[in-house]
Every structure is written in C-alpha cells, then in structure tokens.
C-alpha cells in the first residue's frame, strides 16, 4: 500500500488530506495554528543555483531547509558550509538521489546512512516522495523525521510558467504549509524567477 500511495506524489500540487491520513508516520504539514510557512529545497547543493537561492533568501531575511543529495554536498562542501553558516537547516535526500521503491531496504538504508556521514541530520526526505512502507518504518526506528510536503511548486517542470505556479501556490498554501522547491539544474531558471514572488506573497 505504501508503495502505491507515494508513487503519485510528484503529480500533485497539493497532497489531499485523505492521502495524508492514509500514509501516516511522515510530516506533511507543520502546526496549522501558527502563521508560518516552511520553505524547502531539494536536490542541491550545486553552484549553478544554490548560491543564487541563498542570495535571495538573505535579501528577504528568510530561512529554509535544504534537503541535500550528499553526493553534491561532497562535491561542493563550501556550499554545504554556507547553507549552515547562514542559518538554514539541512536535510538528508540520500547520497545518490535514490528512489526507495526501486531498491532493497538494505541498499536504501545504507545509502541514507552514507549520506548522513556527510550531512549529520535527522531530517529526511525521499527523492520524488517515493519509498516503501518498510523503508519508512526502518527510518523512523532509526530516529529520522520523514518530511514530505503539502504544496509542490513543480518548478522543475518546463511546461509550467511562474505565473501558473504562483496561482496554484496562492490557492493551496495555508498556515503550516511545507512548500517544496528545487535548487537543481533542471529547475534553476524557474526557481530563481519564482522565489522572490513567492516570498513577497508569503510575507
């Protein structure tokens, strides 16, 4: 059941409440009573995008969580250091951007643990939102907080304009929302255009 549920996450802008209730044991949204929205970035750090994202966040005095592919963090250690030095949080996004549903439990956990030797964090987000139920249980048993999202920007999709993404975000964002963006090659042009507009709207 867990495998079937999460495989459709990248297709959705907002995760339906019934799906969140069905797939328990992960964080979809933070405290709805708090007037705070949580901005997250997946797939970095890379020099083509992450520094510009950090510059924009600094300009608006906004903190975010970066779910890093550890292979990238090893390649660009100064970016990992900069993210932490500027007060942002770091999460584990596996070492090799590994899709859980395509790998055994042992291989998946080993990849995450290898990543954690670099990233040193208890926050985890599965690439593409895909993992099996047994992988989820194993990670929780090891003390990881599995953080998904309730609003996905689709900034990686060239078929969506920034204007369209903003309209959808305005429709779905709410108190405690976790918004997922990407600091990746594929998304960088749209991410860097979207981010200032998104922050100005949220502020």
Residue ranges and their predicted role:
Residues 169-203:
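Catalytic grooves of carbohydrate-active enzymes
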Residues 54, 77-81, 109-116, 136, ...:
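Generic structural signal for well-ordered alpha-helices
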Residues 130, 135-172:
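His/Asp/Glu-enriched short active-site or ligand-binding loop at hydrolase and phosphoryl-transfer sites
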Residues 10-92, 96-99, 107, 120-121, ...:
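Active-site beta->alpha N-cap acidic-glycine motif
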Residues 68-73, 96-99, 130, 152-157, ...:
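Short histidine/acidic/glycine/proline-rich micro-motifs that form metal-
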Residues 1-13:
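Helix-enriched interaction subdomains in cytosolic or periplasmic regions
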